[in-house]
Amino acid sequence: MIYYLSRWYGPKRMARAIALVFVAGPIGGVVGGPLSAWLMSSLAGVGGLSGWQWMFLVEGLPCLALGALVWFTLANRPADARWLTPEEKRLVEAEVGGNGGHEHRIDSFSEVLRNPRVYRLSLAYFCIIFPIYAMSFWLPTLLKEQGVNDTLRLGWYAAIPYVAAAIAMYAAGRRSDAVGERRYHSALPALAAAALLAVTPYASGHLVATLALLTAATACMWMAYTVFWAIPSETIAGPAAAGGIALINTIGLSGGFWGPAALGWVKSATGSTSGGLLLMACMAALSCVLILTNKRTVAAAKARTA
């Protein structure tokens, strides 16, 4: 998806484009939480199926339909778009082909594999994804620990952080594009998320305070996620873009497995989610450090690997 967007949007508009597309994630959390809760409670036993089975059927079928629609309607690149005039195609391709003020970009996949900056970005993305997925998976449990036991009520409460995240994502992407800055717009929200997650255990027993802290932390992590992807898209260009972005994405997305799993291990070992929240905070803080220290220019990397 990131590579596809990089073929349509130049570096100057990339953060906002990413925000508009990936805001679907938090919106899915807003709609999906209450909808899933309603499906599981209302359709349990209908047709001999459990509530969770109906949930997978009802929520999975639209994905299949949208997949078919995308296949037949989206063009691979501006030159293939039937809805653009020749002049519009030329303008879009000129913007995408521009370097956005970055004189040195990685243009070959072999250079991607040799460049330490790519691996630093991969690890930073891992550290961003780790708490995002952990929060998504464990949020209902965290709220249950504060006394929320009704399934439908739990679904509505779990949607609140994603409303904030959707708004924060768009605001972060818009401002990052407006000022032309990426690193701090990704790193500082990650640092804020780390601080919020670290103090959340101290609010245990207070539902409103816990939900407020988790909401703010979720919004900050999604802000960091949104602007992060504008960094590699400005660095990796040409034939290397697909492979380079895929490499960062593949390494980083493994955090989506380790995040929820690690919180489960910590809870099993300690009997509490507090340690898991602190682990999420550490990962968010590490992502901040990795992004801020990723200052070495691609030109320097080229000179070193030449």
Residue ranges, per PLM feature:
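Symmetry-related core transmembrane helices of the 12-TM Major Facilitator Superfamily/SLC fold
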Residues: 53-72, 277-292
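Interfacial helix-cap and linker-helix signal at transmembrane-aqueous boundaries
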Residues: 35-47, 143-144, 175-177, 262-271
